């Protein structure tokens, strides 16, 4: 298990870089995590997805899938792919400090 310092806080990460403990995440970490995923700037639309994912995870105990983000979050799939190209669920979960969504390889 690796550790990293994000926004001045040392956190544990798994082999793929996801935070081991979602409670360690802060909003200040998100821009650093986004850069690791190739996203230079987080827009209001990115934050809408990130905040939905965190809230849904707290309520349901699972990382939301793309389908759940579309249905419960009201975020069109096309928008998800535009915001988080080549793997929106994985990238958004990573930036939100959550684990990899079920069904993602």
Predicted feature residues:
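Helix-rich interaction surfaces within compact, conserved domain-sized segments
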Residues: 13, 65-105
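N-terminal first-folded block
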Residues: 4-36
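A short, ordered amphipathic alpha-helix with a cationic face
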Residues: 18-24, 55-58, 66-67, 79-80
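Metallocofactor- and cofactor-centric catalytic cores in central/energy metabolism, strongly enriched
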Residues: 30, 35-54, 58-59, 66, ...
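General structural signal for secondary-structure boundaries
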Residues: 26, 43-45, 76
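A short, structure-level motif marking secondary-structure boundaries and short turns
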Residues: 14-16, 50-52, 74
